[in-house]
Amino acid sequence: MQAYCKICDQSLRSHLADLQRHARSKKHRENSAVLNRTKYKSLMSHGYQATITAEKKIVDIKLALYITMHSSIRSVDHLGELLSTLGKGSNLENLRLHRTKCSNVIKHVIAPVLFKDLVKAIGKKGYSIIIDESTDVSVTKYLCMCIKYFDTTENRMLTDFLGILEVERATAIDLHKSIVEYLQRIGIPLKNMVAIGTDGASNLCGRNHSVYTLLKCDVPNLQLMRCTCHSLHLCSSKASEELPGSLDFLVREVFNWFSISPLRKINYKKTFDLINSGNDAQKFRQMIQLSRTRWLAFYNVVKRLLEQWVELKTHFRIACDAEKCYTARTIRDMLENDCNRLYLISLVFLSFAGQILKPTFLRAAHNKSLVQQVIDAVGNDLAFLPVAEVDFGQEFRKEFQGSQISAERKSQIQQRCFNFLKRFLTEMAQRLPTNFEIFKKIELLSPSRCTLQVRIKFEELPLQDFFDSDCDVSLYKSQWEKLSFVDWNAHYKGDVPTNILVFWPDVYKYTDACGRFIFRELAEVVLKMLTIPTSNAVVERAFSALTLIKTRIRNKLSTSMLQSLLTIRMHFQAHEKCCKMFQPSTEMIDRFKSSFMYESKTGTSGPSCANSDSEENENESLHEMIDIISDML
């Protein structure tokens, strides 16, 4: 298929590079210069107005949202034409939605309204930010920001996507400057920041010079919370040094053995089906890859390996003779070693977070705080049970007693598993947050404690760091004293909820017989404290969404488009909604016009949209020109 230039009377390949090259040629410029470029009046100047009904706008907005959530923008070219063909006699018959229009609907209609609603919902209330930095497939470094706040509309705590900023360097000064300027541009007061959540990187939360220390100069009562998931990962990684290093080799190489060869997987499946023939036979399932960055995620990997232990042992016995491979012999020898099986069984038991953190191996203590009990005990060897009395789980005990391993080797296995637990607790105690006292006292605000007639004094509550500088503390104290006078069982018409994140939002909305919010100020302070994040998993999800959106093929997405796509996707994820339930708001329908969609050079879905990439718009126009020329041939 060829394109044709009417000015030069010349046929061209309908490729973007050829059209651009011809447009820059001397011949085309000279022929274009002699043309009569008289501009004709537009239909608009004669009073003609193109009207699009609200129903058609809703169709375009919903379809653009579907594309944002589930597909690439380029696919709307074919999807729009297909729906127009199949929708004869309906609103879809006159559907005219292609990638240029769809992109502008996303950037200038949907995303700006959702972002505006987010900023409005945050308002002047306290909030916490969760930050992390990463590099995408195009080697562009981004700073991602999420925000945790109490949404009065939905009456619950939400963690939503706030923005993604392109940064040149990830130093503490540069990141701090980007965060402060961003919050100022979008209208969120910096002084209302309660806490900052990070993954533990030194440039983000270092003790001497970091983003946290710089922000603390602006907000003196700022709290720091390192991600518990990352901290547990580091604790587990350090503790795993007490176990044989061959376990990691075994788990990884078993997966690698089948991942590079379909023939090996087919042969193993035949062996598996032969061993598991019968009505009660287990179903064949593939091996799972062990993550290099999430040590705590080894549970499913080890469990799958133990489930197929006999089948794997049989397969590698055959593979040793068939392939004469050193790796196969090594894996076979490790599978035939019962010590390795015992270690893996103990790992399955220890991998449950509750079992890891629960000190069942400690002697009884009178300390009511479980975590404090662990902290006090890790430095005292007398606090631990003898190794022989430590419980590593029923399956481990059964396998341990039936094993033919020598008594010396059994004692060695028990000791190393015990050392794993002890090392884990030691590492965990070292990584506890500096503001640990606040988390210890959160229990005092639980529904079961604060609704009792005999309660702790107001001065002992962990709220002092969250009061405003000009607040009336006596007002909070009086509301705290009145809290136990309410019959909460009658209010809930049953049992009082035990979840603190359910109870205090209801306290925030509680009114007396006159309709007055009698606990509003106290509830605001408590909810402000509860915005402190416990992990930065939401930022990791945002980066995962970025990886799915910006791939090797779609590696030229501008930051403004990326911001809009992530704003929409993460909004629906945070609010637990789907595109099927979406109804465009009145403001979205009002913004669906050319003055917002095409003439705006600065984006409105967040400050990052001001970095709109003009090259992307030029490329889209050129693609549209190619499509028009191709349709004319």
Can you say where each PLM-predicted feature lies in the sequence?
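Alpha-helical structural modules in large enzymes and assemblies
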Residues: 1-633
